[in-house]
Amino acid sequence: ERTVSVSLIQGNIDQHVKWQPQNRRLIFDLYKNASETEWGRDLVVWPEAAITLFREQAVDALVDLDRRAAMSGSALVLGIPDRHESGGFQNTVIVLGEGEGQYVKRRLVPFGEYVPLEDYLRGLITLFNLPMSHNVTGPAKQPPLIAAGNRLSLSICYEVFYPDLVRSSVESPDLLMTVSNDTWFGSSFGPWQHFQMARMRALENGRAMIRATNNGVTALVDYRGVVQARLP
């Protein structure tokens, strides 16, 4: 066994604020500034879509973060949207600094991230025209993320609901990790139910679970499903 030091950054960005173009720099600076005191830990983790610029729009910022994390001996794991060659989007997590790799979400939320029977339903009902609702799935098999020497089995948002998906993600992972944006649930029981799903995956797989959220239950859970640290 070995110890891994982890810092989870929770931005608490309101959903109505998060995707407004004029707030992109403000949100990025919030996460960057919150991380300044955390460099030097093995893992620094930002949640799902922490950066609201598309990946190709954030090249300079990502290069700067990569340099900062590497200088500190840290791996920075963060969520960022990416464009697909088809014109759609991909919900992506990347590793900067002391690590490498990317993960693209494999199981999308119906009507939230994609519209079933899109040719018939898109435009028919206004609700189906949500921002970022034209996502493209990632490959069924993807290389593991490597962060500070750890093989990560990653799931994004509601992917953690599915035991088979988490189990099949990476063979013999060192750690499980899930990132999410739970502002969609508002003040309901949703964030807590989502968190309990993550705890179950830790227990089932006998691996510690790292969970970072924009607004929800951010936590470290050990291999027995026992909560070791939690926000809020």
Regions picked out by a protein language model, each given a short descriptive name:
Residues E1-P232:
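Enzyme catalytic cores with a strong preference for nitrogen-chemistry domains
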